[in-house]
Swiss-Prot record:
EC number, as in UniProt: 2.1.1.-
Record CDD domains: AdoMet_MTases (cd02440)
Chain sites annotated for binding S-adenosyl-L-methionine: 198, 225, 246, 291
The protein's name in its UniProt record: Uncharacterized RNA methyltransferase MMOB5020
Alphabetized UniProt keyword annotations: Methyltransferase, S-adenosyl-L-methionine, Transferase
InterPro entries documented for this protein: MeTrfase_TrmA_AS, NA-bd_OB-fold, SAM-dependent_MTases_sf, U5_MeTrfase_fam
Family to which this protein belongs: Belongs to the class I-like SAM-binding methyltransferase superfamily. RNA M5U methyltransferase family.
Lineage: Bacteria, Bacillati, Mycoplasmatota, Mycoplasmoidales, Metamycoplasmataceae
EC class of the enzyme, as a word: transferase
Length: 363
């Protein structure tokens, strides 16, 4: 069935949404304001899903600078939008999430971008020899990925991936543990294969510098989900002390190595589940930093942080929806002092959000 419709707004994942037979109809690769023809391939009781067939009236914000084949690949959800439209989509999404989920009005929001809008990823998982059409098992052969750093190349003949970075090296031991090393703000980080490290170094650096601005020399800081110690070690010079808590053993080993290698004395890493640590902890912390997974903070963790009563909570999130939901639980005791979004993943619908909460002065 072919439908004609006008795209009215965007879904959370950047799909265009119009209405056909009074049902919301989701179409990938279209822009708000465009009039299109689309083939409806899925019908439910409450919505349609459709595939773009023809653009009848095109938006001025459509991106024509990329080969059409790339639009079909999964992971490039916003590639058809120019940068102005991508920025507008992401800012609107953050503002709408906080309004709908937390009943909080963000009057003004900045979205920070790096210089690279393509070829910004220093790590990518690929299927050797080809990529796949979005939401399918059909393979497409492409000469390159538009998001991968141009220094990351494939040797097809020998089926090996080779990392070529002047400031990065690969290390190994007899136990075949493999690490990469990277440098940020003068601090060297060892990163194991099972440890997390941000894939867009330029934007990550902007975020960490911003976090550092909220740390004072007289503060004891608790860094939850501290990973390999990236935030803990980068803010150490600004704090009285930093305690990092992480349950992943490989990450803790990397964090302790990084602390010793960089000769940083005022940081302590603890290998423990965050909930268990907070339940046993008797130490007061002025500032708590959280950088949870996409699911956000569990309710038990929020309650334990509230009992700790830190003056500041610095919340870095890769999922604005769960960040807004968590703020809903904090807002009776804390107010938003600062919020800013970061375009960690251009050409995709993902957003990194930094929020700083300040304790309310109740009398």
């Amino acid at each position: 069935m072919i439908a004609e419709l006008e795209i009215i707004f965007y879904s959370q994942k950047g799909e265009g949404v119009g209405f056909y037979l009074n049902k919301p109809t989701y179409v990938k690769g279209v822009i708000k304001g465009e009039k299109i023809k689309a083939f409806i391939y899925l019908e439910s009781a409450s919505f349609f899903k459709a595939r773009l067939v023809e653009i009848l009236i095109e938006s001025k914000n459509r991106n024509h600078d990329v080969p059409k084949l790339h639009y079909l690949i999964g992971g490039y959800e916003l590639l058809h939008m120019n940068n102005t439209e991508q920025i507008n989509f992401k800012k609107e999404r953050v503002i709408n999430d906080f309004k709908k989920i937390a009943n909080y009005e963000i009057s003004s929001l900045e979205l920070v971008q790096g210089k690279k809008l393509l070829h910004y990823r220093n790590k990518i998982t690929l299927h050797y020899g080809s990529l796949y059409l979005a939401n399918s098992n059909h393979k497409i052969k492409l000469a390159k990925s538009l998001l991968t750093d141009i220094n990351l190349k494939a040797n097809k003949k020998e089926a090996e991936w080779i990392i070529r970075k002047l400031d990065t090296q690969i290390e190994g031991t007899k136990q075949t543990k493999i690490y990469t090393t990277d440098k940020m703000n003068g601090i060297t980080f060892r990163v194991g294969l099972n440890s997390f490290y941000q894939v867009n170094k330029e934007v990550a650096n902007l975020i960490y510098n911003q976090i550092s601005e909220f740390i004072n020399l007289n503060e004891n800081v608790l860094d939850l989900y501290s990973g390999i110690g990236t935030i803990s070690l980068l803010i150490a010079a600004k704090a009285k002390s930093v305690t990092g808590v992480e349950r992943n053993l490989d990450s803790i080993e990397d964090a302790n190595f990084n602390k010793e290698f960089n000769k940083i004395k005022n940081v302590n890493f603890i290998h423990q589940d965050v909930i268990k640590y907070l339940k046993q902890n008797k130490t007061y912390f002025d500032t708590v930093i959280v950088d949870p997974a996409r699911r956000g903070l569990e309710e038990d963790i929020i309650e334990l942080i509230l009992k700790l009563k830190p003056q500041k909570i610095i919340y870095l999130s890769c999922n604005v929806g769960t960040q807004a939901s968590n703020f809903n639980k904090f807002k009776h005791e804390y107010q938003i002092e600062f919020i800013k979004s970061y375009d960690m993943f251009p050409q995709t619908y993902h957003i990194e959000s930094l929020m700083v909460l300040k304790k309310l002065n109740k009398q």
